[in-house]
Amino acid sequence: MNEFPHIRTPAVAGLFYEADAGGLERHVAALMWAVRPMAQPATRAFIVPHAGYVYSGITAATAYACLAPIRDSIRRVLLFGPAHRVYLEGMAIPAADIFATPLGDVPIDRAGAARIAQLPDVIVSGEAHRQEHSLEVQLPFLQTVLGEFSLVPVVVGRCAAGSVAAAMDALWDEPGTLLIVSTDLSHFHSYEEAKRIDSATCDQLLARSTGLDGEQACGAYALNGLMHSARRRSLQVELLDLCNSGDTAGDRGRVVGYGSFLLH
């Protein structure tokens, strides 16, 4: 690491989650306490949502609680999520050496990130990561459950499923590595319409479809890459929780869908 490391500071602390370390610790602990962990020692990957914690925190916690039985075996997290703040063709790894949160610093696995950067469709872009919330909101959960770990964060723009799968596969099989894909589901439909759309999307994920689009999930490109790799590996997709903002903290006129899944 550089003598003066490049640190990505939090972009959405105080917006999507508490900026105060003590308040954030208490909120994450409460979310984790509220869900029942499902022991899955063969877990290879998770799909988790990325809205503000009052909206999707409980759905995310349902996945992160499953890490408890295997936490000691995980030393590195590959984290893929969609680009919301910049237009991006392909994928981007950060220029930063550290991602900071109110709970502390998460070191970037620069060697692992450099290997992904050698692939076609991958660039190094600090700007793609600077304001991106889809990856950042996962970090306090990971810090709470895992303690110390290194991170390979990848922002995904418009990209073929095979290219995304290749980026995942570059490091996924190495010991101590967990893969997480961050995505929300449908956006801004009525409560009942969102339930219909998200249920159909869930069925496609359970069938490992690589044909998802942005109307179904903002992380469709990352999900299609994950499903591409999951098919090749004969992994199964299991639903942990499915809801929308009308079930948690929002009105039911215009809702956003959330789901958590594990792959084993």
Identify the residue ranges that each predicted region occupies:
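Active-site histidine-anchored catalytic micro-motif
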Residues: 2-250, 262
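Short hydrophobic/aromatic beta-strand or adjacent loop that forms the aromatic wall/cage
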Residues: 255-260
